[in-house]
Amino acid sequence: MSGNLDILALKDDDVNKMLAATTHVGSTSVNFQMESYVFKRRPDGVHIINLGRTWEKLLLAARCIASIEYPGEVFAISSRQFGQRAVLKFAHYTEATPIAGRFTPGAFTNQIQPAFREPRLLIVTDPLTDHQPVTEASYVNIPVIAFCNTDSPLKFVDIAIPCNTKSPHSIGLMWWLLAREVLKLRGKISDKWELKPDLFFYRDPEEQEKEQAALLEAAPAAKEMYTDEPIPAVEEGGNWGEEAAPAAPAAAAAVPAVAGAAIPQMIQADDWNEDETQTAGSWGGATGGF
């Protein structure tokens, strides 16, 4: 499927990621249509998936998704809790339409209901749990891409990507790989994608609460380095003379002789002004007498 092109070949780094996420581990039973994707069977009865075939089908699915002119007409669906976060992240980066959670029956066939949609391509996490949208897609001729385990039914599935659909890490990694290849074909990213696959992994709400509690316990130790007292606000446009006024009595107490001498002079100056006014008035009267 890669056409002997290095850029489309399966890299060792991707193989290591698949092995770490147990993407190659299937189930104990095999559907007759999935036998061609099984590499071998372990002594404990678990079937091993051929990762070479997984990569070929992943590239084929990425080409089909990239060929859609309007990305919003591609619907990513996951009713399983482990795949809902991965579906939302895939839709965010590829501009697809996500349906995470319960699928409304008749969304593809009943034109009367408000939730009616007409997608051009459907991607499901597991055809066994997402059987309702897969069945409705067959009624309206919508092609379906599905991540399939060794025991998954391939009825109404057009492109099956063999992988482990029971591991949260495997589901998140496969959605991450599919999003990366789609963005490569659209020319939006280079060979390497800086986004980590951990962002697509399912996170348990209880573990998140424990992490938040641990952060809250560590927060008081960090707060001891700082004071909780509020900093007084500085009033803008205040009268700076009012702030210096309280210092005047202290200065007067320090030099009482100078302050006491200055007061009579000010009174005398006021009296002199009053006398001058009265004298001028009497002089005018005297002048008028002549």
From Swiss-Prot:
One cellular component (GO) term of this entry: cytosolic small ribosomal subunit
* Principal subcellular localisation of the protein: cytoplasm
**Compartment annotation:** Cytoplasm
Name of one Pfam family that matches: Ribosomal_S2
InterPro entries for this protein? Ribosomal_uS2, Ribosomal_uS2_C, Ribosomal_uS2_CS, Ribosomal_uS2_euk, Ribosomal_uS2_euk/arc, Ribosomal_uS2_flav_dom_sf
PROSITE patterns, alphabetized: RIBOSOMAL_S2_1, RIBOSOMAL_S2_2
Q: Name one GO biological process term.
A: ribosomal small subunit assembly
Biological role stated in the UniProt entry: Required for the assembly and/or stability of the 40S ribosomal subunit. Required for the processing of the 20S rRNA-precursor to mature 18S rRNA in a late step of the maturation of 40S ribosomal subunits.
Its subunit composition reads: Component of the small ribosomal subunit. Mature ribosomes consist of a small (40S) and a large (60S) subunit. The 40S subunit contains about 33 different proteins and 1 molecule of RNA (18S). The 60S subunit contains about 49 different proteins and 3 molecules of RNA (28S, 5.8S and 5S). Interacts with ribosomal protein S21.
Q: What is this protein called?
A: Small ribosomal subunit protein uS2
Species? Culex quinquefasciatus (Southern house mosquito)
The record lists the lineage as: Eukaryota, Metazoa, Ecdysozoa, Arthropoda, Hexapoda
